[in-house]
Regions:
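Short aromatic/hydrophobic contact patches that present stacked aromatics
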Residues: 6-8, 51, 77-79
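Core segments of cupin and vicinal oxygen chelate
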Residues: 9-58
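C-terminal cap/linker of serine protease catalytic domains
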Residues: 132-158
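A generic structural micro-feature
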Residues: 44-50, 70-72, 133
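A charge-rich, low-complexity, intrinsically flexible signal that marks solvent-exposed coils, linkers
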Residues: 41-43, 74-76, 157-158
């Protein structure tokens, strides 16, 4: 049964490649269907992959090969919670090392321009603590690209 809510992500032409990458990178992620265009359309031809149904950490998504009209930006991102530095490094390196780009505060973009937040729970816990602990956590995070959990935990302790 199809879910009531699905995130639709517009790609130029690489929705299938992106979905396969996400399925190989993140747990509870898979490609569930590939649909080909039944006729020519403005950004493709009959038989080209038009849409791809997939999940990213259990979130249902639809990749649409709609052409170059619209680009991904930071207004939408997937936030992936991590439990340790190894997991943080693995996801970060998979995204950045596969043609992506580093950004600040745990944010990065994949090679298709989709934004990701690779967010250790130690960071979110420190920011949620309030008061001086949250301030120290925030100040430690601000100059980071990939989050260094040891530095975050040191800042949390003061």
């Amino acid at each position: 049964m199809k879910p009531k809510n699905t995130i639709c992500l517009w790609f130029d032409k690489d929705a299938h490649a992106a979905a396969l990458f996400y399925a190989a990178t993140f747990p509870d992620s898979k490609v569930t269907a590939v649909h080909k265009a039944p006729a020519d359309y403005p950004s493709g031809k009959k038989g080209d992959v038009l849409t791809v149904e997939f999940t990213v950490v259990g979130i249902p998504c639809l990749g649409l090969n709609g052409g170059p009209q619209f680009k991904h930006n930071e207004a939408f991102s997937f936030q992936i919670a991590t439990d340790n530095q190894e997991e943080t490094d693995r996801y970060w390196n998979a995204i950045v090392g596969n043609g992506g780009k580093e950004s600040q505060c745990g944010w990065c973009k994949d090679r298709w321009g989709l934004s990701w937040q690779i967010t250790p729970r130690a960071l979110t816990d420190g920011l949620a603590a309030g008061g001086a602990e949250a301030k120290r956590t925030f100040e430690a995070m601000m100059p980071m690209q990939k989050i260094d959990i040891a530095k975050i935990e040191k800042a949390r302790r003061g």
